[in-house]
Every structure is written in structure tokens, then in C-alpha cells.
Amino acid sequence: MNENDNNLENETGFSGRLIVVSNRLPVSIKKESNGKWSCKMSSGGLVAALSGLKSNFIWVGWIGAEIEEDDRKEIKELLWKDYSCIPVFLSEKVANEHYNGFSNGVLWPLFHYLPGDLDYDDRIWNSYVEANEQFSSVVAEILKPNDLVWVHDYHMMLLPEILKQKKPDARIGFFLHIPFPSSEIFRVLPCRKEILLGILNCCLIGFHTYDYARHFLKSCTRIVGLETAPNGVYFKDRFVQVGVFPVGIDPDKFFESLKTTQVQNRIKELKESFEGTKVLIGIDRLDYIKGIPQKLQAIERLFQKYPEWKGKLVLIQVAVPSRQDVEEYQKLKKEVEELVGRINGLYGSIGYSPIHYLFQSVDPSELTALYNISDAALITSIRDGMNLVAQEYIVCQTENNGVLILSEFTGAAQSLSGAVMINPWNTEEVADSIHNSLLMPPEEREEKHQMLLKYVTKHTASHWGLGFVKELNKASSNTDKMVTIQKLDIEKVVDIYKQSKRRLLIFAYDGTLIPYNNVPQLSRPSQELLNSFDILSNDPKTDVYILSGRDKKTLSEWFLGIQIGLSAEYGCFFKLPESTEWEQQVPSMDLSWKETIRPLFKYFTLRTPGSFFEEKEMLFTWHYRNADPIFGSIQARELHLHLDNLPLDVIVGDKTLGVRSYNINPLSSMKKVITDTIPKGLDLILLIGDTHIHPSELPTFDGKIFNISVGKKSVKDSYHLSDPAEVNYLIIN
């Protein structure tokens, strides 16, 4: 074990293997003239960010090209031996449609708030699914019980769900390196639900900023209908943690670079070249989200409004080539070059160009020198996940205390409070901010720079990586502890059922026998379910009861002719299997409270579009399933507060709020049934749904009790079924 292994375990408490999954491996491959393959480590943001974690570490990703079957064995051995990497071999078609088609043609523009640029079709979606399938198969093949799987970015949003299907105990985390858009933007995506369900199969989901996490949580509520908390989502029978982890850089790399002779000589050359001139630096990929046209328009406005800067200010704009084969990027390049030409033509002269435009990649030494000699950095992204250029600029400003002018639409803006914040769409504001930043007093420059430097040197790439792994390890351990509710072994229960002498089966209705329906009247039992109950009820050794919030009339019609017991309006009324008559649990009940409740329910129904209420003999139920999920929940909480002040029993259901007299207990009748059945040899009780009885409540019963939760509801000491379909399967058996 090396020093970095100890670092990972000491910092995170995790001693197993970490499997990192990203679209591309951090390695480029090349076939040499002798026919042998060679590999070379590549650079990149994720490579740098994960460098502090390099320990018992496996990286899974695409190799970047289609590889012939005959070469795959050699490449796999080479990558594993030298780099602990495992390649995923995709066909050229799948790779292109997955990466260029769906990931960058659909998800990238949508997540950066440009839904008009979507180019969606089923063909590229199918390739996205196929690529995620192939990645998950590679991970599943190498996965061991104590491993952590860390999935990266928008290319792999289906992988967690697919991997969970193959390996149910997998401990998976997901981190999104780009913004997550508001739910109003995200819902444009045709496959929006599949994407959300894909990453919800994680223990931990990470974002750069609180805004991105909040947008994700709202999408889970609005699109999937899930209940959320500020730090996570209730999904199936567990809590998926959602956290904020702003990524950083490796400052030491830049500090060391600044000390080299090569960089110092270059700094000296650049200072001599721009002596007497203020220098602005812009380093961006040539991408429409980076706001380079907006930056150039602001520079043009600066020269118009403050002509004194002519001849005294230059912008060095590096535009790193990106996706040059895509038409939109070609148009962007043309637009940028035309703006550069126009500004240099209007405000330049012989020997002076206000904009030095470089359409090329710049090596790290040159980049460090450019950062160092600049008086200010200008970042005008119209939407950016984080933007690490801002942090790189800060650590290279060792003497100058340069000013960081930063778009408020970057993720970095939420962390770098010492920057001058701008709205890149407000050309006037950006021009003024440049002017004021270049004239900022030295004391203020130093104060802002020290604030920024303190943050960047603390929140490094290593800090980010170790922090995420630590939280993932903790979240997956908590998930393991939470899963105390056993999945019901249906075959085992059926065997116990067959061996028992007398059984009592008690079912809830909505959400247990039938899925919740936006229109309650449409939740009729299927003919198959009715047939199953008819068969069960004709067995002299079996008693069946259904507990429901429905009224007597509805239940009588639905289960007409079937000899089962029924409880209506959450226990207000009760009917024995052999009877057609309903009994009122509490005779001569005072219902004067209904006159107070009726106007209150009407008031909240009018205030909450999509909601409605039902008035039954002894029960009011307010339904808000069809309301906006967030607003509906807020209104339900407020209504609950009003009801808490009244001497009534409030029943909180799934998107419902019910009210009845406080002296009614739906289990009272059932306990009487159980007590009456015990002398007849009762030795098995199944309670399925949200009604549960602890054995201690039945001191004279010494048989078996199965409390079975359905769906997301979890009760201690109970078993669990996922949905009504599994309940129906149990009944049929």
C-alpha cells in the first residue's frame, strides 16, 4: 500500500476499491509502426481532480476509438498493467450517437438552458441506453462486495439503475459536472423520467452548487412525484442523499510551475511586450455556453464609453478548439472571428491590437505565464457548471493581486465571493465592471485576492474527491443500516400459508391492492383480483378483510357477492364477511364538527388548483394528487395546522388529508375479529399495507404475524413488497 492509499483510508474511512466510471479513460492509445500498441496518460479536468485519490483505484471508460476484436486483449492487458484502467469497447456508431448525438446534442444544450438547440430522436436515445448498458456490464463483471462505484457526468445517467439491476447491493455515487436545470427546462426532455430514475439508484448524488441540487430535487417531485428533503429524496424504500461538492484545482501544480525557469522567462517576455498596457485574460473553450461573443461586445462597449483605454488595454482571448465538425460551433467560430476583426479594425492601429485572439490549445507553462501577467481575468459564461479557469487565475496571481471578473451564471460564482460579479447579458454592466476593476485601489485588490486565494487553496481537487468518497462511504453504510425491512419472500409465505390451520388476511386498499389513481372513482378492483378474493373467501380456513377510506356504498358495489369483511371510511363502518349489514363503530356519534370543516376544505380546494375533497358520512378527505406537487404539499401542511387545533383525528395519506371523529380506531374492530378467531385455531395473520399490529398487542396469540409494507412506506419489524403488482402476485399464489 502506498502513501496515497493511506491518504484515502485516513481521510474517508474507506479501505476498499474505488471504481471510477467516466465516458473517456484518462489514457490515449496509439498503434506503433511495429504493430504494437502504446498508451499515454492524458490531461483533463477530471484527471486533475481525481489525482489526490489515486490509490486502490480502477478507472472504467471508453478508449476513444473502435477497436478490432483481435487487438482488444492486448489493449486490455496494457491498460490494466500500466494504468489500472479497464476499457469499454463501443462500436463507432454507438459511440458517436451516444456522445455526439444524445449526450452533447440533447443533454448538453438542455442542461445549459438552451432547449431550442435539442436534436432528439429515438435512434440516438437507443444508443445512449446501449452505451450505458455496456458500461454497466463491464463494471458488474469486476465489482466486489466492498467496492464503491463513482459514476461521472451526464454521459452515464442511466448506468446506476442498470448496474443496480445486475448487482442489487452495489454502492454507487453519481456526480454531475455540469448544471442541473430548473424543472421547467428539464421537463422538456422526452426521456426525463428515465434519466431521473437512472441516477436515483445511487446512495449519493453530488452537484457543484446548491442551486443545481435544488433543481434536481424539484424535478424529482414534479416529474416523478417523489417526496424530498433538503438533503435528499425518498425513493422506493430508502433515502437517497443529495449533496453539494464544489470541485477545485491542484494549486501546488501552479505554484511549482511558477517557480520554473521556463515560466519565469516567459513572464518576463510578456511583461516587456505589454509594458504600459493593462492586460485582460480570457481562457475558454470555443463553446456557446462560454459567452465569448458577449465578452467581445462588452469590450467594444468599453472602448465606446471609455475611449481613454484605446492603446492602453488589450484582451488576450484564448479560444480552445472544441467540436469543430459541428455546424453550430463552426458558426460560433465565424461570429467570434468577425467580432475580433471589427473591434481590432475600429480601435486598433499600427503596432496596437486591442484583442489578441488565439484559436488554439495553450500548453500549461504558457497558460501559467498568461495568468500571472494579467491585471484582470474576464469570464462571461452564459451558463457553466463550475469554471476552473477562475481558480487557476487566482493561484497564479502571486504578485499582481489581479481582479477576477466573473459571470454570475457560473457554479464558481457561489463560492468565489471576492470576485466582481457580472451578468454577461448586460453589456453596459460588464463594460463598467472592467473599467472599475482596472482602476481598483491596490488595497481593495489585495483584500479581494486574499479572500479568493484562501478559498481556492483550501477547497482543492483533493479536498473535493476525498470529501465525496467519504460521504459516499457514509451514505452507502447508512443505506445498508436502513434496509432492516426484509423483502417478503413470497414463496416462503405461501408455504407457511399452506401449512397453517387458520389464517386471517387483512389488506389496505389504495396503494396496496390498487395503484393510487388521480381519479379515485377509477380505482376499481380488477376482475382478476375479485376472482382471487372469491377463491380465498370460499376457503373455510381463511378470513379476508379489506380496510379502506372508501364509503360503504362504493365498497359494497365493488365487492358484491364476495364473502369478505370490509371496513369503510377508515374504520367508521364495519361489515363482517357473512353479513350484508354495516355496523357503525361508535353509535350516536356527534357530527356537528362537519359544519366547521366543510368551509375550511372548500377554502383550501379553491386556493389549490387541481385539488378536490370528498364528504362521506363520517369522513372528509382532501385530495391534492392532481395539484402542483410542491404547492400541494405546502397547502396540505397549512391545512394540517388548522386541523390540529380541532378535537378531531387527522389521517395523513398519500397525497390526501382525512378528518374523522377522534374516538374512532380502525384497528379496534380488527382486534376484536382476531380475538374471536383465536379460539378457532388461528395461527397466521397477514397485515398488508399501512395497517400493522405488534405481537405484544395480542397477548393470547402465539402464531405467526407478518406486517407487510407496500411501496415507499416503511414500518419497523415489517416485511416489504414494492408495489400492488407484487401484492396481487401474492394473492394469486
Curated annotation (Swiss-Prot):
Its EC number is 2.4.1.15. It catalyses: D-glucose 6-phosphate + UDP-alpha-D-glucose = alpha,alpha-trehalose 6-phosphate + UDP + H(+). GO terms for biological process: response to cadmium ion; trehalose biosynthetic process. Keywords: Carbohydrate metabolism, Glycosyltransferase, Transferase. The keyword Lyase does not apply. One of its GO terms (molecular function) is alpha,alpha-trehalose-phosphate synthase (UDP-forming) activity. CDD domains: GT20_TPS, HAD_TPP. It holds the Pfam family Trehalose_PPase. Synthesizes trehalose 6-phosphate, the precursor for the production of trehalose, the main carbohydrate storage reserve of the dormant spore. Trehalose accumulates in both prestalk and prespore cells and then is rapidly metabolized during terminal differentiation of stalk cells, while being stored in spores, where it serves as the principal energy and carbon source for germination. In the N-terminal section; belongs to the glycosyltransferase 20 family. This is Alpha,alpha-trehalose-phosphate synthase [UDP-forming] A.
